[in-house]
Amino acid sequence: MALHIHEACILLLVIPGLVTSAAISHEDYPADEGDQISSNDNLIFDDYRGKGCVDDSGFVYKLGERFFPGHSNCPCVCALDGPVCDQPECPKIHPKCTKVEHNGCCPECKEVKNFCEYHGKNYKILEEFKPSPCEWCRCEPSNEVHCVVADCAVPECVNPVYEPEQCCPVCKNGPNCFAGTTIIPAGIEVKVDECNICHCHNGDWWKPAQCSKRECQGKQTV
């Protein structure tokens, strides 16, 4: 007949001078003989139900004691019916987090996005760039790109042109206006035909030219 471990302890206690009663206490979580669980004739395991809790490493905890069952588990309290574990209120994960680890009770952000993505390209935080001649953009700390479009002045001509790498249109021939279908320069009087002399309104290039009729040689004045 196999000798139980706790029976051996009891025999030792009755031998004077060898083992005192202080050698085994309630701190050692003794299990009753009837609570021992045997998987075969050679192995005997103590059953701690109602007396304590055991973690993944085999450590025993008292009733009411707080402990972590495993590395990735949340804290638990040892109760009569076994560990009672509650999920704590975990910190919020950063919305720009690109790498989250779940090795502990709460998920933990290990890497936060530190760049901006704009039209398929990545830019560093606070980096300024020009995606087009008319745009000035910057990568903000919020990982968002803010852009400003150039505020171009109204050209003082009716035929502005766009030069390469320039955002705003320019008047290559200076200010002008329309005299009928003819473009005339501003600031001077221009004879547009045999009978009409025209000039642009000062500063009002979008208005049609002001024209005056003169006597025409060989033609009747309209």
UniProtKB/Swiss-Prot annotation:
Annotated PANTHER family:
BRORIN FAMILY MEMBER, VON WILLEBRAND FACTOR C DOMAIN-CONTAINING PROTEIN 2-LIKE
Stored Pfam families: VWC2L_1st, VWC2L_2nd, VWC2L_C
The listed locations are: Secreted; Synapse
Reading the lineage from the top rank, the first entry is Eukaryota
- Chief location bin: secreted
Keywords, ordered alphabetically: Developmental protein, Repeat, Secreted, Signal, Synapse
Q: What is its quaternary makeup?
A: Peripherally associated with AMPAR complex. AMPAR complex consists of an inner core made of 4 pore-forming GluA/GRIA proteins (GRIA1, GRIA2, GRIA3 and GRIA4) and 4 major auxiliary subunits arranged in a twofold symmetry. One of the two pairs of distinct binding sites is occupied either by CNIH2, CNIH3 or CACNG2, CACNG3. The other harbors CACNG2, CACNG3, CACNG4, CACNG8 or GSG1L. This inner core of AMPAR complex is complemented by outer core constituents binding directly to the GluA/GRIA proteins at sites distinct from the interaction sites of the inner core constituents.
Q: Does the keyword Acyltransferase apply?
A: no
Domain (VWFC): give its ranges. Answer: 51-110, 114-172
An annotated GO BP? negative regulation of BMP signaling pathway
**SMART domains hit by this protein:** VWC
- Entry protein name: von Willebrand factor C domain-containing protein 2-like
Write down any Gene Ontology CC term: AMPA glutamate receptor complex
Q: What does this protein do?
A: May play a role in neurogenesis. May play a role in bone differentiation and matrix mineralization.
Protein source organism? Homo sapiens
Kindly indicate where the leader peptide sits in this chain: 1-21
